[in-house]
Amino acid sequence: MIVSMLAATDLARILDGRRIADDLLDALKTRVDARVAAGKLPPTLAVVLVGSDPASVVYVRNKRRAAEKVGIKAYDFDLPEATTEAELAALIDRLNADPKIHGILIQLPLPGIPDAHRLIQRVDPRKDVDGFHPQNVGHLALREFGLRPCTPRGIVTLLGHTDRPVRGRNATIVGVSNHVGRPMGLELLMAGCTVTSCHKFTPPQMLEAAVRQADILIVAVGRPGVIPGEWVKPGAVVIDVGINRLDDGRLVGDVGFESAVKRASWITPVPGGVGPMTVATLMQNTLEAAEAADC
């Protein structure tokens, strides 16, 4: 059973990503409604899906539903799995040139296309609402305005809903992917944390030590239970980005939840923690892309 408040047993409070994401979407809808009332176009999002991977289909459906809730107009581009890189590049070029399109979402992975990064770089950075383009990551590194990667930005929003300070805290990130771990480090540096990043070359004893000293622990590896809950520092805030399906069908994170919940002050559930925030932040970026296009 998920714990919703700090109980007498000192279990962690749950960072309910679904509730916080819904609140963010409601706030975005208010801004979109005001925009439309002022005679401006509603924000628009081109959603590009290649193939029919079940997980990708679910993710795209969730993003389309969120767009509809906020008042963002989504344009669907559902392409066959045999779509070539050249064909996808041509579509991206058309969307880049279309002033009625504010945001472009390329759902990853792209079947049959070995270098998705090359296509991500082709998206106009001003329409890169995923925040994956090197120019947008560079803006984040330089603490400049840009479209920030959705999952790290959503995690920062989650951290703001705890009663724990962020500035001056020790933060450990486990996992250094381009889309989560690396930009997460930049976000936390900007927030005033002292950041330690761990990866596959980090010796096990060093990994354990880094986790045990973390006031804020963010794990994004994609391996169930890779971080034992017993390692969590008492009172730490734990953000579990991993989502893994076990043989029995259960979805679990990268952190041993049953033991971590007894040590942390706040912890995200899996599912229902980081995932909804990523989707809501995508809508936030899309609205900001539309607002920037007005200037």
Curated annotation (Swiss-Prot):
Signal peptide feature range: none
Any single GO BP term: tetrahydrofolate interconversion
MF GO annotations: methenyltetrahydrofolate cyclohydrolase activity; methylenetetrahydrofolate dehydrogenase (NADP+) activity
Keyword line: Amino-acid biosynthesis, Histidine biosynthesis, Hydrolase, Methionine biosynthesis, Multifunctional enzyme, NADP, One-carbon metabolism, Oxidoreductase, Purine biosynthesis
Pathway named in the protein's UniProt entry: One-carbon metabolism; tetrahydrofolate interconversion
Binding locations of NADP(+): 175-177, 243
Pfam families hit by this protein: THF_DHG_CYH, THF_DHG_CYH_C
Gene3D superfamilies, alphabetized: Leucine Dehydrogenase, chain A, domain 1 (3.40.50.10860), NAD(P)-binding Rossmann-like Domain (3.40.50.720)
Annotated catalysed reactions: (6R)-5,10-methylene-5,6,7,8-tetrahydrofolate + NADP(+) = (6R)-5,10-methenyltetrahydrofolate + NADPH; (6R)-5,10-methenyltetrahydrofolate + H2O = (6R)-10-formyltetrahydrofolate + H(+)
PANTHER family found in the cross-reference section: C-1-TETRAHYDROFOLATE SYNTHASE, CYTOPLASMIC, C-1-TETRAHYDROFOLATE SYNTHASE, CYTOPLASMIC-RELATED
Family according to the record: Belongs to the tetrahydrofolate dehydrogenase/cyclohydrolase family.
Protein name per UniProt: Bifunctional protein FolD
Originating species: Xylella fastidiosa (strain 9a5c)
